[in-house]
Amino acid sequence: MKPAARRRARECAVQALYSWQLSKNDIADVELQFLSEQDVKDVDIAYFRELLSGVAVNAASLDALMAPVLSRQLEELGQVERAVLRIALFELSKRDDVPYKVAINEAIELAKTFGAADSHKFVNGVLDKVAPTVRKRK
């Protein structure tokens, strides 16, 4: 699959995870609703599904990875930033085929696209501290 299709999968995953985090609905229901309502042309659907289910199943452990380095309580973290960080930490911890730098750079780009003005700086700072403990640089 092309890198652009993976990027689109990540973009869609941020949006779907944002909805899931706010609604607390079952992730499978969120996925079905998202896929039926959104334009998913040029999206790596299999990767989108893997990100959604992987983050949902591992949310507590992903949050535990980031919590020690956050400058505020996890509950105070913006929903976009939380979704972006969870995706990056899922990729770093569970997807060895995704290079270290790619996971971080993609997270920064997602934060620039969906987050507040300085979200990308915050995401970069958190991942710079957490990523080396999750996976050796590749």
Curated annotation (Swiss-Prot):
Keywords: RNA-binding, Transcription, Transcription antitermination, Transcription regulation
InterPro entries the UniProt entry points to: NusB-like_sf, NusB_fam, NusB_RsmB_TIM44
Listed GO MF terms: RNA binding
Source organism, top-level taxon: Bacteria
GO cellular component, one term: cytosol
One Pfam family in the UniProt entry: NusB
Residue ranges that the Swiss-Prot or TrEMBL entry lists as coiled coil: none
Biological processes annotated in GO: DNA-templated transcription termination; transcription antitermination
Family: Belongs to the NusB family.
Function text: Involved in transcription antitermination. Required for transcription of ribosomal RNA (rRNA) genes. Binds specifically to the boxA antiterminator sequence of the ribosomal RNA (rrn) operons.
Protein name according to UniProt: Transcription antitermination protein NusB
